[in-house]
Amino acid sequence: MTDYGHDLQFGAFITPTAQPAHQAVELAVVADRAGLDLATFQDHPYQPRFHDTWTLLSYAAARTERIHLSGNVLNLPLRPPAPLARSLASLDVLSGGRVELGIGAGGFWDPIVAMGGRRLSPGESVAALEEGIEVIRQVWAVDRPGPVQVRGEYYQVVGAKRGPAPAHDINIWVGAYKPRMLALVGRAADGVLPSLGYLPGGAEDLAGINRHIDEAAGAAGRDPRAVRRLLNIGGRFAPTGRAFLDGPAEQWAEDLAGLALEYGVSAFILAADDAPTIERFAAEVAPATRQLVAEERTY
Amino acid sequence: MTYGHQLTFGVLLDPDAARPGDGVLLDPDAARAGDSVERARLAEELGYDVVAIAEDPDGLDAWTLLSWVAARTGRVQLAAHTSVPPRDPAMLARSAAALDLLSAGRVDLTLTTGERAEAKGEAEAIEIIRGVLDADDPRPLTYRGEHYRIPRMQRGPLPAHRIPIQISGYAHSLLQIAGRTADGWVAELAVLGPDGVAAANKVIDEAARAAGRDPAEIRRTLIIDPGVSTDDLLPLIVEEGAGTLLVRSTDPTVLRRFVKDAIPALREAVGKTAGTVPGRSAAVRAKRRAGIDYDRVPASLAETAVEPGDVEYARVRNTYLRGGAPGLVLRPRTTAEVVDALGFVRAHPGVPFGLRSAGHGISGRSTNDGGIVVSVAALNGIEVLDEAKRLVRIGPGARWGDVAAALAPYGWALSSGDYGGVGVGGLATAGGVGWLAREHGLTIDHLRAVEMVLADGTVVRASADEHADLFWAVRGAGANFGVVTSFDFEVDEVGDVGFAQFVVGAEDPAALLVAWGQAIEAAPRDVSGQLILGPRRPGQPSFAQVMAVVDADQPDTIIDRLQPLAAVGPLYDQNVVLLPYAGIMANAAEGYHRAQGDPVARSGLIEHLTPEFAAAAARMLASGAVHWFQIRTVGGAVSDVPADATAYAHRSANFSVVAMGSDPRRVDAVWRDLYGYFDGMYLSFETDRSPDRLTDAFPPATLARLRELKRRYDPHHLLRDNFTIDPRGGQR
């Protein structure tokens, strides 16, 4: 049993489809009104069926009131970190502190390269992400003296002015699965954001993910609780329970409470592109899961 | 001189100007952020045409701010003044497309050079941005320049409108780029002075002419300080051709004063010399097709017309099933504009002409190669005329999914095909075999009146009492007689319905067809549906898809009705849901049509699925020439209507049969064996254009009457895209 004691968050993972142009925005508005905590969009800049995720996030942030927004996850290889940091801070200011940074090292290198990006090996991409995070944090650190100074292998940002200052401490959540990336999360990130569907061993793989992060955090002198464990999930509502996250809302709540209590997952982001599912997740699953976890935690 | 652009006014939310001297600033960024958004909204409210946002190295990210402003405004144009680098042209293009789609076509780009005086990569950036946005080009974008290299990226998304790309700067190199390739040039008056503007214009004009462009293609935008007097501005407009003035200010008082004092005075003073819609660029005109008099497009249609070089072309060239390359697409929004459009078509007697509602037609091509298409998509109103009589008026451009959704709140439905993306106009002038056909008849059986524009441009109303002959003809052969601009229907009360989808084994397709046909004929009229078979694939099990709608809201009744259908073959999968009729019709794909090629479809109407017919159908499926075989139910209420009551005459059939393939000779070779069993056909599912097919679509008496009416109403044979009846043809 691993439980890092975080408050539970619930979000939507919305396809940033370019057609119909407003579908993704409207679903973010639905998620906002339904009371979810997060609206997130994947980011594949080489995929023209999708909106540019940053533009969509900015537009959706302006159309929502309360919900936090994040890429899930933004593509660092095609989004240089210094301008990205400035964009994030800008949207955070505009939205009153509702932006978080889900970021990834890049996975689909062929289309990245086809668009003019640089191909990196897995190891290189981890190092590049670590440098990128450093650049981003330095840009945001307006109270620190002097300009941004990162002389990295992959990013050299020397002498750039810091700022603007974000409106709140923007969380950096990293899409991570493998030991080197998880170690980076433990050292430098505020959260880990894998997709349950990509875990070859299913939810049980979360134990290994946690172990790598916790060890790296400890080695870096950080409290493992500084790293939130987020999870992209998929499922469907059905009148009777058939399988994990395939059944009625009450069953979903039990499934998710299990993940929260067993593996310390504290943010569940549901892949959903229809309003009824988002509304049901918010109205029925989220409160029931919170209640189950709260009851269990009081023991 | 002027360049003929419509004079527009904007506000440049310049970070330097935004540094407020008034008010208390606790958090400068936050205050300025809110400030910029409020100023943008104010500018829109005051009637400015443009809000421009410049990069601010010390402030907020310009693109993020512009995206935010886009979401908080509704009309004003959004101009991004930004630089490459740091922005990457390909990524900027993707971002611009997204914001243009989200803001319904309000984005324009101005490339600035920041501290740098000379051009460095701007020309390449423009090429790349345009290349990414050219989503109509199916080839990937490859670019090898001095500054940028793109190995092979996918283009798109297609923006909502042609995003203008302007160049800002003063160096000769930048003016050259402006003249050679950009859509506009932006400069600060305070930097150049009036003489400098004149000199720069000269360089731009010369560069434009040298590149084979009309200097008028390049809009000239001047950034002005609010203090400049109207007297000083006027010559810049009338003599130097400034088309846009951007006031650099964030002071509400200044913005209001400029709107109140300067803009009306300037507009009035230049009223006679400026203000036309800018023409298409040389590059766009170069893609025009021969035989079409583009300069004579009626003024009412010019703004919405689409030609091959336009961004919008990708969205209108193809249909659901066909690739096309029309030379001109006219998009009337009113009956009067339809009259204008047909006038233009009449002036082009030798040019192909297609008529389109939503572009789903099989018999009606509604696209062509090098011809004219009149799309009535904008005539898409859905209006209740009389709630007590359930009388609704629907435009031809509405789609049936939208109609179903609009009628649902009243508890009404109009049976109309099985796909929500089909347009009203084509289906409601041909027949309309829908999910409730056996209970409620064809769509045309609910028609009470139409307004239509005849070939000669006359607007008439046709009903049982007015132009009764036309009203008869329009119900089954409407495409021959005019452009219907509105349909009055009496619709039905329909509550929730049962919708079943079964997968049944089809190892013996002939036996399956016979069993299904018998089950349908034995079923009460509240059951309608269809059966779909594909070709046999060697070594693989064969399946049929059986779908049915039961107009009943009691689960017991629905199950009762469905049992015989589920028993026609081994049942492999089933899904039965109770839902509103509109829920079944909410099945249309989103986005514009991207079909390529030209399908082959054959149609036949038949009374009974006899063992002999079924055996022939099984042989056809085994041949592999047909990749889609579909039988829909008619009969029932469809057969209640006398054969001579409408131009759709084959009322005795119980089934409408369709086969689709790609090779007409192969399809015909196998279709021939089925042909003898049919009693006519439903023209909407037939692609064969040979005149013989007319005699299948219309029995002799019907055809004779149609031909006589065609001679009267369309003697010059204007309407010829969909089962055309040649007025000169003989009596078959």
What are these regions (language model features)?
Chain B
Residues 1-285, 511, 528-534, 539-564:
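Active-site-adjacent structural elements that line small-molecule/cofactor binding pockets in enzymes
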Residues 262-732:
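Soluble FAD-dependent oxygen oxidases
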